[in-house]
Amino acid sequence: MKRTYQPSTVRRKRTHGFRARMKTKAGRAVINARRAKGRARLAV
């Protein structure tokens, strides 16, 4: 059986990257929440 997680840097950046987050209102909320919490890494 093939595993579900087949890592791809491109897909990872496109779906969870900083620019992808900034595109939507909800994504910006995620970034702001992580900033408020003091996360060292805001996005992938």
UniProtKB/Swiss-Prot annotation:
GO terms for molecular function: structural constituent of ribosome. Pfam families: Ribosomal_L34. It comes from the Bacteria. Keywords: Ribonucleoprotein, Ribosomal protein. One of its GO terms (biological process) is translation. PROSITE patterns: RIBOSOMAL_L34 (PS00784). GO terms for cellular component: ribonucleoprotein complex; ribosome. Coiled coil: none annotated. HAMAP family: Ribosomal_bL34. Belongs to the bacterial ribosomal protein bL34 family. This is Large ribosomal subunit protein bL34. It comes from Thiobacillus denitrificans (strain ATCC 25259 / T1).
